[in-house]
Amino acid sequence: LCADGPACLAAEPLARRLGTTKGSFYWHFKDVPAYHAALVRQWHAQALADVMTQLEADGASAARLRSFGHRIINTPSEAALRVWAQSNASVAVSIAEVDAERLTYLQSLLNGFGLRNPAFSHAILASLIGLPQMHTGTDQHAAFDALVDTVLALA
């Protein structure tokens, strides 16, 4: 998905890439939509588990905020899934659910700094979605940290 986009998520390209047969693919999955559903379920579960891990983490809120952002930036499948979601409604629904949880988590962190305006959490999440889409040679972690510094300076 990351290298070749959603078109590579069909039985034949997957079998070719893995050096196996289409029959092997169909042994594991009823059909291509079932494979897609399993792939999205796995990402969804992992993304929500990451939010829960951050919720349960110890440490200063600023460090937790940075860690949360860096984990998203470091997930290459995130950007690829968002591209896929533009043409696949079930992927879009899954991403929207994860984004809602992420916004709730971000807002809870920002509330701790006295920043109650939900636009801040939306701006932070938007930067996490957009930074990996940029191909300018920008240090994405440094750019995210600069945004966090700016938002926290308002507290």
Predicted features by range, described:
Residues 2, 6, 48, 52, ...:
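Short amphipathic alpha-helical interface segments enriched in basic and hydrophobic/aromatic residues
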Residues 31-34, 60, 90:
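Residue-level recognition of oxygen-bearing side chains
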Residues 48, 74-80, 89-122:
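Amphipathic alpha-helical packing segments from all-alpha helical-bundle domains
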Residues 92-96, 111-155:
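Hydrophobic/aromatic-rich alpha-helical bundle segments in the mid-to-C-terminal region
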